[in-house]
Swiss-Prot record:
This is Chaperone protein DnaK. The gene is dnaK. It comes from the Bacteria. Residues 599-631 are annotated as: Disordered. It comes from Rickettsia bellii (strain RML369-C). Keywords: ATP-binding, Chaperone, Nucleotide-binding, Phosphoprotein, Stress response.
Amino acid sequence: MGKVIGIDLGTTNSCVAVMEGKEPKVIENSEGERTTPSIIAFANGEKLVGQSAKRQAVTNPRNTVYAVKRLIGRNFTDPMVKKDQEIVPYNIVKADNGDAWVEVEGKKHSPSQISAFILQKMKETAENYLGEKVTQAVITVPAYFNDAQRQATKDAGKIAGLEVLRIINEPTAAALAYGFDKSASKTIAVYDLGGGTFDVSILEIGDGVFEVKSTNGDTFLGGEDFDTRILEHLINTFKKESGIDLRNDPLALQRLKEAAEKAKKELSSALTTDINLPYITADNSGPKHLNIKFTRAELEKLVDDLIEKTIEPCRKALKDAGLKASDIQEVVLVGGMTRMPKVQEAVEKFFGRALHKGVNPDEVVALGAAIQGGVLNKEVTDILLLDVTPLSLGIETLGGVFTRLIDRNTTIPSKKSQVFSTADDNQHAVTIRVFQGEREMAKDNKMLGQFNLEGIPPAPRGVPQIEVTFDIDANGIVHVSAKDKASGKEQRVTIQASGGLSDAEIEQMVKDAEKNADEDKKHKELIEAKNAADSLIYSTEKTLTDYSDKLSSEDKGGVEEALSALKAVLDSEDASLIKEKTESLTAASMKIGEAMYKAQSDAGAAGSASEENTTSNEKVVDADFEDVEKK
């Protein structure tokens, strides 16, 4: 079994790690950074991922996709999708299956597909470091992700060419990294406030056992929401000062978004910052500049309710675990937003204890995923991870009631069966509608899917016995079966959301990803070939000018001919042809090298001769002498 990489697929940034010996290690990307922006851009048919996509976002906002994790596994009618549509510059559209997709340059992409581009970048980063192909991964998701979101994340891995061995909850991964080298038994809380989601998990750890007691959270609460509050503040302040509303200007909005994120980070260590954006817009009177002084106190006032919103899930998680805040022995902070002093203050106040800041909040989740990868491929032993399902699972029964089969915070993997019956006389088929959530009525919860059990023998209502079994695997993905005990008829399915990607769609996306990978590789080869050719043309022309008088007319003609031939193909799209002409010019220009060497040798020889003359002259000494014989 090869190396299993651990990937933290984040809303704002992503990170990849691997077990190296007995320790997990974060792998730097090609830009030398330990995290990669979860941003994809499309520019004139070319796909950019990570930092390169982020750099051009200001000039290409409509074709730059970020925070797509907040859309993954969601239906287009989801209120959170509507909320997202109001704040992102790119186009969110309804897919044929009812899911929320993004449309860029006239082409629709599923959130799983966009996420796959980021996962491919993580995969390449690991492969470049390890020097070998990587095919298996552990990918993290927010603990409060539902089945549809987990399935969509697994699909993203498949599209990226990865076998996803395990989907692991982010706080659980962080706890693994925190407790990996510790043997003491402790009850800890992991408070994870990232770019787009919030989770809190309560765990008991000790002697290599990591047992999740409860989890809670909000899959639409994170740094993006904090940025939006600052963005709104800047827009309103500028409108008050200039009378201009920047909401309908995508370029200005992108600049404001970047400025908001930068100001938020600066105010974690400073009390005040200046936001200066020259030429933000223009009107009839000329260009307008934005210059706003922004303080930490103003920021805290803007986001106070968002911070407070994270405390209620902490309260619920403690209650579900049967614990009090005073029972928690360590509070581990995860996610970039936990660097904010006001966030730390609120968490410290709730738990009534000092916070553990000994882990890097941006990297700890990927490190934990790498450890889990090590467990799965037997590199790491003596670790047992017991996670839970975040939401209750059940079916719709008579009157639209949600009947739970598996309660939230049940340890997974888990299996539970319950017997139901028919609602009408002589009913020959039943529809099993599967839901996930905590509301009492099925319609108020998330519908995961449905299937039919047919061929039930005619009988009065209430007589047939239909056994429904829920089976949750270690990834938190649900499998459901229904069996008529009398006839033995059984229907078994892995639940897929009513939307979601079909196997055929995933297969097509895998092929597209492979094709794109080949095209990207060819494009890179072409760029490198053109750069090498351009560099050679420049150096050859320069040296030809300096040493043309030292070349024979035949050699000079050969170099000029090869030079013209390379220039003629420089704009072509054929990398092999450019390489061929580059090699020809390299061979021809060796004559210039010989001429340069000869010229330098001749100059050296002339210098030596001159030196010898000088030396021999220096040995002649003028002296006065006396002719003794004449005396």
